Amino acid sequence: ISGMILSGGYPELHGKELAANRTMRQSVKEAIKQGMPCIAECGGFLYLHRELEDQDGIFYPMAEVLDAKAYRTNKLGRFGYINLTANEAQLLGDKGMTIRGHEFHYWESEQCGESFHAKKPVGKRQWDCVNGNETLYAGFPHLFFWSAPEAACTFLKKCEEYGTC
C-alpha cells in the first residue's frame, strides 16, 4: 500500500467495533507516522483522533494520530460548500493552492487544524481548518478534486514516491 484515503463512513456509529480493532488502529497510526500519504476527510478525520465520542456519549480510543478528542455537538456544524485555500505547503500542493469542498457534521474536534482557510462562496463566514503536512490532509472538509485536479495528481505522485522508498 502506497497511500490511504479515509473518507466518511460515520465512525461515530461504530466506535466500539473500531476501538476493538487494535491491530487496524495501530497499523494506521504507524503507516502515517512513517510518512505514508493519507487523506482523511470528515469521518476519516474523526478516526485519526485519540478518542471519539459515539452517538451514545461514550468515548472510544481511535488511531491516535491526532492528540485530541472528537465529540458530539447538539447542532449541525459548518454546513455546505466552501472554497479552501492552503495556508502552507502540504500534501495536496503549495501554499495558496485552492480546492472546493463541503462540510456536513454534528461532531467537533479539539484540533481542527489551520493548514487551510475555508470560506463560504456566499456570505462572510470563514475559518481555518485541516491538519496538514507533507504527507497528511486531515480535516472535516470533503474535497472536490474536479475543482483542482492538480491536487489529486500531487497526492498520487506522493503515493508513488512513498511506494518506491
Task: Tell me the role of every PLM-derived stretch.
Residues 2:
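Conserved acidic residues
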Residues 5, 23-24, 160:
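Glycine-centered secondary-structure boundary/capping sites
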Residues 5-8, 39, 138-140:
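Structural motif
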Residues 8-15, 129-131:
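Short, flexible active-site loops
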Residues 11-90:
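Cysteine-nucleophile active-site neighborhood
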Residues 71-165:
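Amide-donor transfer/coupling interface in amidating biosynthetic enzymes
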